[in-house]
């Protein structure tokens, strides 16, 4: 789960911006009512419902119902050239560890935001809040 409450608040704010109504968090995710999360969300905590749940159980249920489950990985398929569904669930990884092997096994499609850096010594990865914004923007652009 997301460890930094500020990142969770940013994700809630971005979700609100893109019209996402529900966020599902694993039990080890930062607390939505942490003051840092509340501040970073800029009020989005009152518009985006946050559910703390057992993610593997939830993902299994959603997959059985036919809902696509996307995961974000450094080695996934390029989000700009991959076919995307108009509905589904997007799993964002933990800041330090990414998505766990257990959750990875439940994702139907692995996505990545490609780097356009000029050299190999550039930034290794994106902040999870920034990555969430880019991912949601691309999904919404294609709708």
Which residue stretches match the model-derived regions?
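RNA substrate-binding interface of SAM-dependent RNA methyltransferases
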Residues: 1-75
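Short, flexible micro-motifs
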Residues: 4, 12, 46, 74, ...
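Short glycine-rich loop/turn motifs that provide flexible caps or phosphate-binding loops at active sites
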Residues: 8, 42-43, 70, 92, ...
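Structured adenosyl-cofactor binding patch, chiefly the S-adenosyl-L-methionine
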Residues: 17, 32-43, 101-143
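Short flexible/disordered coil segments
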Residues: 66, 87-94, 132-142
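Active-site/ligand-binding-proximal alpha/beta "capping" segment
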Residues: 70-123
């Amino acid at each position: 789960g997301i460890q930094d409450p500020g990142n969770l608040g940013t994700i809630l704010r971005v979700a609100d911006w893109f019209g996402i109504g529900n966020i599902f968090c694993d039990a080890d995710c930062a607390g939505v009512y942490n003051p840092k999360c509340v501040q970073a969300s800029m009020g989005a905590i009152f518009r985006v419902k946050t559910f703390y749940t057992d993610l593997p159980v939830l993902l299994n249920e959603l997959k059985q119902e036919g809902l696509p489950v996307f995961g974000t990985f450094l080695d996934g398929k390029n989000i700009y050239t991959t076919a995307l569904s108009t509905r589904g669930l997007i799993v964002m990884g933990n800041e330090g560890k990414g998505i766990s092997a257990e959750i990875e096994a439940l994702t139907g499609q692995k996505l990545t935001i490609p780097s356009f850096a000029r050299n190999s010594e550039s930034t290794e990865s994106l902040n999870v809040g920034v990555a969430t914004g880019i991912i949601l923007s691309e999904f919404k652009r294609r709708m």
